[in-house]
Amino acid sequence: MMGRIESVFAKKGKSAFIGFTVAGDPDKETSIRIAKALIDGGTDILEFGVPFSDPVADGPTIQRADDRALASCTTPDTIFAIVREVRAYSEVPIVFLTYYNTIYRRGIDRFYLEAHEAGVDGILVADMPVEESDEVAATAEKYGIDPIFLVTQTTSNERMDTIVRHARGYLYLVSVLGVTGARKTVAPEALALLNRVRSHTDLPLAIGFGISTPEHVTTCNLAGADGVIVGSAIVDIVEKNLGNPDAMEQDLRRYVSVMKKAAEQ
C-alpha cells in the first residue's frame, strides 16, 4: 500500500508544496488553526517544526517562533495532541523537523511510537549525521515513518550515496549555505545541487531554505524539483498577525494558494 508521502509525489507533472509551521506557535489552539489554514490553502505536505531552545539550522524568524512556542509551555505531549487534531481534519502527510535531543529525552522508541500513533508520516532530525542514524532509522522503519535527510552543497558524492541508502519519502535539499530565511532569488548552486543529487537517486527531491515567492517555485519547477519547502515566509505571516488570528488564517490561505498555483504550473 502506498504511503501518504509517496502518494503526493506520485502525481506526475506537479511539484509538491510543503508548508512549514512551528508546532505550538504561538500557542496550541492557534497552532492548530494555522495548520488547518495551510491545508485549506492547498499544502500538499505539512511540516511541523518541533520547537527547540537552540535550533542551529534556523534563522531569526523561526527562532522567534520556537521561542513563542516554548514560552506557551509547548511540550511533546502538546505537539502530539496538535498532530492528532490535524490528522482528524485531513489526510495530508505530516512531517516533523526536529533535533535529536528532543527524541533522546523522550526515548527513541517512545517518540516514534507516539508519532506513529498521532499520524506522523516522516521525521527529519536536523542535527543527526547519517553515519549515526542507524538506531533512529531502524525505529522509524519499525513504525512505518519515513526517515528524511538533508543534503547540502557541501555533501560529498560518497556521503550522498550513504544518505540515499538510509532515506525514505523524499530528500530535503538545502538551497543555500547558512540558516533558514527568505532570499531574493534561488541560488544557481541550488539548481546545480539538484542535478547532482538527481544522478544519485530516484527519490523525490524537495528544495528548501529561502523559498518564498511564486517566482522561486517556478525556477525550482523548471529545474526539475519534485517539491518546494516554504517555512520562514509562512512563519513571518504568523508573526505579523499574532494579534489577529482571523486575519492570520486568511493571509495564510491566500499565500499558500498563490504558491500552490505556481507549483502546479
Swiss-Prot record:
SUPFAM superfamilies: Ribulose-phoshate binding barrel (SSF51366)
Keyword Amino-acid biosynthesis applies: yes
Keyword list, A-Z: Amino-acid biosynthesis, Aromatic amino acid biosynthesis, Lyase, Tryptophan biosynthesis
Active site: 47 (proton acceptor), 58 (proton acceptor)
GO annotation, cellular component aspect: cytosol
Enzyme class: lyase
Catalytic activity reported: (1S,2R)-1-C-(indol-3-yl)glycerol 3-phosphate + L-serine = D-glyceraldehyde 3-phosphate + L-tryptophan + H2O
EC number of the protein: 4.2.1.20
GO molecular function: tryptophan synthase activity
Function text: The alpha subunit is responsible for the aldol cleavage of indoleglycerol phosphate to indole and glyceraldehyde 3-phosphate.
Family the entry assigns: Belongs to the TrpA family.
PANTHER family: TRYPTOPHAN SYNTHASE ALPHA CHAIN, CHLOROPLASTIC, TRYPTOPHAN SYNTHASE, ALPHA CHAIN
Oligomer and partners: Tetramer of two alpha and two beta chains.
Name of protein: Tryptophan synthase alpha chain
Record lineage: Archaea, Methanobacteriati, Methanobacteriota, Stenosarchaea group, Methanomicrobia
Gene: trpA
